[in-house]
Amino acid sequence: MRLYDFRTEYRENPIGLTEKAPRFSWKIESDEKDTVQTSYEIKVTDENGKLVWDSGKKISDQSVLISYEGEALAGETFYSVEVTVADNHGNVESVEGSFETGIFNQTEFKAQMITSDFSEDETACPIFGKTFAIDKKVKKARLYATAHGVYEVTLNGQTVGDYRMAPGWTSYHNRLQYQIYDVTEQLAEENEIAITVGNGWYKGILGFYCQPNQYGTQAGAFAELHVEYEDGSKEVIATDETWAVKTGEIRYSEIYMGETIDTDAPEIKEGKVVVKEFDKLSLIHI
């Protein structure tokens, strides 16, 4: 018997979970005929090695979406999971995995939704940016990001993550999805973060009558970088009025109308960052 495909909330070793009682799933395979699971035991430990939940041995063939029932999970914390399973042939095997919690309460975000003072007629994509220095050894770094529009983040010139068309299309006034990225290895002593935002579904041309501005008239960015250092200290770098904004080589961008890029000599226009009114309770993690 072998255990495989262990998942927490449908994902393999996820980060940024906001579920306070995450669910665990796994699969079994065996070369023996008519093999079935007869029991399982789940143990969860925190990043300090403390046991926070031991399910005890459960006589059950259930292996899908088993809910965590231990002590309250801490936010932004790494947890290890071990599942031990027995089958009807007397075999006992284990599988390990992990998950990391995120920010449970949206009001704890320090970032602000920022936009620019560019006119509504400006077709070039705004690029929101900030430079910052790090002078201590980094333990881990997580970037929370979303936008009014569709966004792409670069950190020190490298694209962050593999999402495309993030954060996705929702009823933006009610729900705005955000993504979380592990950027630990991308940080250096001197850093530059840049967020390019296209119109997307938020401001872009949609519908039978090809009308823009279905949800708003200004594209915006919302991001928060959480850095934890080896000495235990933490730092948060969040979008606010101290960021800069400019246009770049993407001169026009529409999901259904195409994109124009000028790589030769784009007309760079610098603007002023404007903080936009935004309800953080609409934020949801996917």
Located regions from the model:
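Short hydrophobic alpha-helix segments
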Residues: 6, 55-56, 96-97, 163, ...
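Conserved small/polar residues in nucleotide/adenosyl-binding loops
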Residues: 284-286
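Extracellular/lumenal carbohydrate-interaction signature centered on repeated Trp-anchored short motifs
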Residues: 16-18, 73-75, 185-188
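Recognizes extended acidic, P/S/T-rich segments that occur
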Residues: 28, 35-78, 84, 88-93, ...
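Long, charge-dense accessory insertions within large macromolecular proteins
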Residues: 274-276
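Extracellular/lumenal ectodomain signal focusing on beta-strand-rich modules
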Residues: 5, 39-41, 70, 82, ...
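Accessory beta-strand-rich segments of carbohydrate-active enzymes
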Residues: 26, 64-66, 78, 87-89, ...
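Non-catalytic, glycine-rich low-complexity segments
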Residues: 1-34, 97-132, 214-216
